[in-house]
């Protein structure tokens, strides 16, 4: 290091403290990167890589980006999974001898973003901290630095922790140093391998230390005051998240004002497979919002509302009162369409107050941010006036929560100009009339500039040089510029200041005196404006809790307006939600498919599930007939009702579910050595272990990934278990291709058979999409193959084979399907047939008879059976 320049020694010393981050090292108007950071950044950012000490034996690779346009470069590095450490000059170079002091002012990580340009407005940006405690208790803490949201809970087992992580969908996961992913269960390990995982020192996970961090942040005497008693793992996870936040922000985070302790039992439980299969927030086809339930219901007009709706669908409720409160509010807004439209119009102009409040609290808000806050607050009084006549409890509560913040509105309105500049340090941000001293300095500056114009005219007249001009630049200040052709006319009192190629620049005592006065005023204006802006921003930050309350109320109102608008447009009904085991839906529809308008009328269907006669609906019918759509729509209607939404049906009674499980199609997971069938069995086992009489199960084609007999046996046993086991006994939709399972309805009192109605016409099959009582008589697989565009030859051959199988036709000891019309009959082979001949079957059946135990009726039936076999 001794061979390096002082600047490079400073760089290397600072870089040693941040080995896992790309160091953006401020050099004047640029952030520069050196050595390995430069090699990495130049490749990812596609910027020029050069080097210092070119041609020598110790070339130092480096590259740089302009400080005023740094955000997109940071964004690209973050998107590629890298952290960025911002190292600023913390001294004025003009007032420093030697090397300028520099410090890392913050470290930007994927989970700690606050800049609007880096964030999706509709999605939260969570940092998730996980900690495995004693007895498989997992602490789960998650926060969004951009909004100030902070939550913590404790869950039993890695499966529950994984389910919660999938729901949260964090940008970054925090674990303790020394925790090895290889020690986690395969599914959790696989999930974390796809995430950006950061580490906190092991010593952070010590109760006294984390307790002190949490108490200091929230001003509490003890963590117990915050509801963290009895959550030892949750406390450590929350403390680690705070530690990581403070270490990387390098500044106070006052906008994180409270921590919410929640219990998972407060919400409808949805495991990762169910969230994926029901396409709640993202479609399975493209992984996007479009085509999901969220995309179908989202008519919100604010970023806050969009995020709140996503939370409601991700965390449906199980408490009757809060569900009914939401439904009542949606109903009132639905019935008052005119008021609803006026409310939505007012909401459209409201900025993202949650994230504005976060930036204000962290002292990173600009003048434009404060003005956006002001313009948003202006919309609250007319909005509250529209809400004044609301009757339902939730809407009345929201009216109180949405604070117009008149004092903040007045402060920002008086203090900040309507169109503030981007920069905070170059003036023009504070409104005239706000500060007398600033007004006086501006007057001096303005008069000084007028003096310059008058002086220029005066000197032209005095010297007779018509081309004389008074110029200004930041290095030399003001000067009188004379072209070289006019140098003979320069007065004796002119003092040369600068020589140019075609001119000379001069200064006079009079100009110098006014320069000092004007430039001094300009510098003072910039300093004073920045100081006044900081003062205004700090006063606004002091009211952050009120801003947060208003923002939350506005977000909820936006969601309710959105749900009411969708319900009005699509003819949704208000569900009756109770604590029974009944799910009774009349003319239910699939909300997403119905909204897609695919060119055919969506066929509604009824559903009745209960804990009595209709606990399990055994649903048979051909592929493409609509079984999966029907079952998913029942699950989605249940979820929507518990989220507080109206539902796509003529009427609906929904007995609250504690969990929704779905077991539908899966693909091989070869990276974990798991086949489709293994995944199917694992998901089914998880359902049987965790389901309760309050749960809703959707089982689609269980057992199809193995042989027919094995599949039938497994599906049969699973259905019996759900029916017979008192601790399970869930309401269940059970779709199957195994027609044998319809026999269960004869032996199990709470199983009912249903099928999808089909009409055959001219050798064609027409799917009526209607669910009717009874079992399917045909699978219609060949007709589906024809619809899929299978070649005609294949279709005809399939028909022939099907007739062979249905008629039990054999030839020379083998089924007729073993031979093709195009094949020559092979020579007899000494190898035994895999199929028994009819004669062998008869002989085997007779040998097993016990004539002594047969009744006369059984003997007659048996004789008839043997005759049919002969």
Curated annotation (Swiss-Prot):
Record GO cellular component, one term: cytosol
Residues where ATP binds: 621-628
Pfam families in the cross-refs: MutS_I, MutS_II, MutS_III, MutS_IV, MutS_V
Gene Ontology MF terms in the entry: ATP binding; ATP-dependent DNA damage sensor activity; damaged DNA binding; mismatched DNA binding
Domain of life: Bacteria
Biological-process GO terms, alphabetical: mismatch repair
Keywords, ordered alphabetically: ATP-binding, DNA damage, DNA repair, DNA-binding, Nucleotide-binding
Region (Disordered): 813-834
InterPro entries for the chain: DNA_mismatch_repair_MutS (IPR005748), DNA_mismatch_repair_MutS-lik_N (IPR007695), DNA_mismatch_repair_MutS/MSH (IPR017261), DNA_mismatch_repair_MutS_C (IPR000432), DNA_mismatch_repair_MutS_clamp (IPR007861), DNA_mismatch_repair_MutS_core (IPR007696), DNA_mismatch_repair_MutS_N (IPR016151), DNA_mismatch_repair_MutS_sf (IPR036187)
Keyword Iron: no
Function: This protein is involved in the repair of mismatches in DNA. It is possible that it carries out the mismatch recognition step. This protein has a weak ATPase activity.
HAMAP family documented for this protein: MutS
Family classification: Belongs to the DNA mismatch repair MutS family.
Name of this chain's protein: DNA mismatch repair protein MutS
Organism per entry: Pelobacter propionicus (strain DSM 2379 / NBRC 103807 / OttBd1)
Gene: mutS
């Amino acid at each position: 290091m001794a061979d390096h320049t002082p600047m490079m020694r400073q760089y290397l010393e600072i870089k040693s403290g941040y080995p896992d981050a790309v160091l953006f090292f401020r050099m004047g108007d640029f952030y520069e990167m050196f050595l390995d950071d430069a090699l990495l950044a130049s490749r990812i950012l596609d910027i020029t890589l050069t080097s210092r000490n070119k041609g020598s034996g110790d070339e130092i690779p480096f590259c740089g980006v302009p400080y005023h346009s740094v955000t997109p470069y940071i964004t690209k590095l973050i998107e590629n999974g890298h952290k960025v450490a911002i190292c600023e000059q913390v001294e004025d170079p003009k007032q420093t001898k030697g090397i300028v002091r520099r410090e890392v002012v913050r470290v930007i990580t994927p989970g700690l973003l606050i800049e609007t340009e880096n964030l999706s407005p509709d999605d939260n940006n969570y940092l998730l901290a996980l900690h495995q405690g004693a007895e498989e208790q997992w602490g789960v803490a998650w926060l969004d630095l951009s909004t100030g949201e902070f939550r913590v809970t404790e869950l039993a087992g890695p499966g529950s922790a994984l389910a919660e992580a999938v729901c949260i969908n964090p940008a970054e996961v925090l674990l303790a140093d020394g925790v090895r992913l290889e020690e986690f269960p395969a599914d959790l390990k696989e999930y974390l391998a796809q995430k950006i995982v950061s580490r906190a020192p092991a010593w952070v996970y010590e109760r006294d230390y984390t307790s002190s961090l949490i108490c200091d942040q929230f001003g509490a005497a003890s963590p117990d005051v915050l509801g963290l008693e009895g959550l030892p793992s949750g406390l450590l996870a929350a403390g680690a998240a705070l530690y990581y936040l403070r270490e990387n922000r390098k500044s106070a985070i006052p906008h994180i004002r409270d921590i919410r302790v929640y219990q998972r039992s407060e919400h409808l439980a949805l495991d990762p497979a169910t969230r994926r299969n029901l396409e709640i927030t993202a479609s399975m086809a493209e992984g996007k919002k479009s085509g999901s339930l969220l995309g179908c219901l989202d008519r919100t007009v604010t970023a806050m509302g969009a995020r709140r709706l996503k939370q409601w669908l991700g965390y449906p409720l199980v408490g009757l009162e809060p569900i009914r409160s939401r439904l009542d509010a949606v109903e009132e807004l639905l019935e008052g369409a005119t008021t609803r439209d006026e409310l939505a119009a007012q909401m459209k102009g409201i900025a993202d107050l949650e994230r504005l409040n976060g930036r204000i609290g962290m002292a990173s808000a600009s003048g434009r941010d404060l003005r956006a806050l002001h313009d948003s607050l202006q919309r609250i009084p007319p909005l509250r006036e529209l809400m004044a006549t609301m009757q339902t409890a939730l809407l009345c509560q929201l009216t109180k929560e949405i604070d117009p913040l008149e004092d903040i509105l007045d402060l920002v309105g008086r203090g900040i100009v309507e169109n503030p500049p981007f920069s905070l340090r170059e003036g023009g941000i504070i409104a005239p009339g706000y500060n007398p001293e600033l007004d006086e300095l501006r007057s001096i500056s303005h008069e000084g500039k007028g003096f310059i114009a008058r002086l220029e005219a005066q000197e032209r007249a005095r010297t007779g040089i018509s081309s004389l001009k008074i110029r200004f630049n930041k290095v030399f200040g003001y000067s009188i510029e004379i072209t070289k052709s006019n140098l003979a006319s320069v007065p004796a009192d002119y003092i040369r200041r600068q020589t140019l190629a075609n001119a000379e620049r001069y200064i006079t005592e009079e100009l110098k005196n006014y320069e000092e006065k004007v430039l001094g005023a300009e510098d003072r204006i910039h300093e004073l404006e920045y100081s006044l802006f900081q003062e205004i921003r700090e006063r606004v930050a002091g009211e952050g809790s009120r801003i947060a309350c208003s923002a939350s109320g506005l977000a909820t109102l936006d969601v309710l307006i959105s749900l009411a608008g969708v319900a009005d447009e699509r003819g949704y009904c208000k569900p009756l939600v109770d604590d029974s085991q009944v799910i009774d839906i009349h003319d239910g529809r699939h909300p997403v498919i119905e909204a897609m308008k695919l060119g055919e009328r969506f066929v509604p269907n009824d559903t009745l599930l209960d804990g009595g006669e209709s606990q399990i609906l055994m649903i048979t019918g051909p592929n493409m007939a609509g079984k999966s759509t029907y079952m998913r729509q029942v699950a989605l209607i249940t979820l929507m009702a518990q989220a507080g939404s109206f539902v796509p049906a003529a009427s609906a009674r929904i007995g609250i579910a504690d969990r929704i499980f779905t077991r539908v199609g899966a693909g091989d997971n070869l990276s974990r050595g798991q086949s489709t069938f293994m995944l199917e069995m694992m998901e089914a086992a998880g359902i049987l272990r965790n389901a309760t009489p309050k749960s809703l199960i959707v089982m689609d084609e269980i057992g199809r990934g193995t042989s027919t007999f094995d599949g039938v046996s497994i599906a049969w046993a699973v259905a019996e278990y759900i029916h017979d086991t008192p601790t399970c006994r869930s309401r269940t939709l059970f779709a199957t291709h195994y027609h044998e399972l319809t026999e269960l309805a004869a032996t199990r009192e709470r199983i009912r058979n249903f099928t999808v109605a089909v009409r055959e016409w001219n050798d064609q099959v027409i799917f009526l999409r209607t669910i009717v009582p009874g079992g399917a008589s045909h699978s219609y697989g060949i007709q589906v193959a024809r619809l899929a565009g299978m070649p005609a030859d294949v279709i005809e051959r399939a028909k022939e084979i099907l007739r062979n199988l249905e008629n039990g036709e054999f030839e020379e000891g083998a089924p007729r399907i073993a031979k093709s019309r195009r094949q020559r009959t092979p020579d007899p082979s000494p190898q035994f047939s895999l199929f028994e001949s009819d004669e062998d079957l008869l002989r085997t059946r007779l040998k097993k008879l016990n004539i002594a135990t047969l009744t006369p009726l059984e003997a007659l039936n048996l004789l008839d059976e043997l005759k049919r076999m002969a």
